[in-house]
């Protein structure tokens, strides 16, 4: 947690979602507990978190993982109120190829999770696509491979319904025609620090700015998210997202793959022209994304 004067370490936990691969509601199994490294390919060391592409649990292939930050008491999901704050992390995307999505995002999940498994077994997930049947507001700080990156706001007409599944996002390749930014200007073979600034106060969010820092240099993408950029004057406005963030969002780390990822890094969104995740999963199961140095606090805190 950071101020302009510096940062102090905060302790917490990571928990996996209730679903592991195709195995649902893991708390119903015997035993229900995970060996995170072996079963879901997740390793934590100090302030560093890695997610591996392929693992095996209960004899079944598990692709990727979805993880939530839990508070220091290990009782509730940690809630973050982002308006007027900055969220920063370093990520190593060097192994994340076409068709793989290394995502870091926030959703308005209930802090106590949901019954019957609660926080302990990763219950309570929701997002703007209503993936598990539960809808809520979602802010994608990063969805990316090493070919393209996008950040996107997804507001909803209410806290639990009517979500804007497409959202309003910014991808330098797609939206500025800057095909060199993510890959050349930013060397994706080296770790990069990504800074997201949520401009506003209280529950009033007016702009979301993005900076990338690498090799001692700061690279601002050409555009930030505003109501003007998004052409949003209804529920899709940043005002709606700001109110949601003021209630508190849970931070999610996700790694998944799909042959239908052209919306993110193919077509007009990126240079990928074909996808074969089955080949990737079999030939490079140990592909991983590594997140580190996660920071949250005052805008313009030390990167």
Question: Could you say what each language-model-derived stretch is?
Answer:
Residues 77-83, 165-190, 240-244, 281-283, ...:
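Exposed beta-sheet edge/beta-hairpin loop segments within beta-rich domains
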Residues 8, 13-14, 162, 169, ...:
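Secreted/processed peptides and extracellular or luminal domains of membrane proteins
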Residues 63-69, 153-156, 265-278:
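Short, polar loop/linker segments at the starts of domains and inter-domain junctions
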Residues 1-137, 142-146, 251, 281-303:
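A long-range scaffold signal marking pre-active-site subdomains of enzyme folds
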Residues 2, 110-114, 120-125, 131-133, ...:
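Aromatic sugar-binding interfaces of carbohydrate-active proteins
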């Amino acid at each position: 947690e950071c101020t302009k004067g510096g940062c102090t370490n905060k302790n917490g936990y990571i928990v996996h979602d209730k679903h592991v691969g195709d195995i649902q509601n893991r708390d119903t199994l015997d035993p229900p507990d995970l060996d995170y490294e072996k079963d879901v390919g997740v390793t934590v060391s100090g302030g560093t978190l890695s997610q591996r592409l392929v693992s095996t649990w209960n004899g079944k292939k598990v692709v990727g993982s979805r993880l939530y930050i839990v508070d220091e008491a290990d009782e509730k999901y940690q809630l973050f109120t982002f308006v007027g704050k900055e969220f920063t992390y370093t990520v190593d995307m060097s192994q994340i190829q076409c068709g793989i999505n290394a995502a870091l995002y926030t959703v308005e999940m209930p802090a106590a999770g949901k019954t019957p498994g609660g926080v302990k077994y990763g219950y309570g997930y929701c997002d703007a696509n209503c993936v598990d049947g539960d809808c809520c507001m979602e802010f994608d700080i990063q969805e990316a491979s090493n070919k393209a990156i996008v950040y996107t706001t997804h507001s909803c007409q209410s806290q639990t319904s009517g979500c804007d599944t497409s959202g309003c996002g910014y991808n330098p390749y797609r939206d500025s025609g800057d095909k060199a930014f993510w890959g050349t200007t930013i060397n994706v073979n080296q770790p990069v620090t990504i800074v997201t600034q949520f401009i506003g106060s209280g529950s009033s969010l007016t702009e979301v700015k993005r900076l990338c820092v690498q090799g001692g240099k700061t690279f601002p993408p050409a555009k930030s998210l505003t109501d003007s950029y998004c052409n949003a004057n209804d529920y899709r406005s940043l005002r709606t997202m700001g109110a949601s963030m003021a209630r508190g969002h849970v931070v999610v780390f996700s790694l998944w793959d799909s042959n239908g990822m052209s919306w993110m890094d193919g077509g007009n969104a990126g240079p990928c022209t074909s996808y074969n995740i089955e080949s990737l999963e079999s030939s490079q199961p140990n592909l991983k994304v590594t997140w580190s140095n996660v920071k949250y606090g005052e805008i313009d805190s030390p990167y």
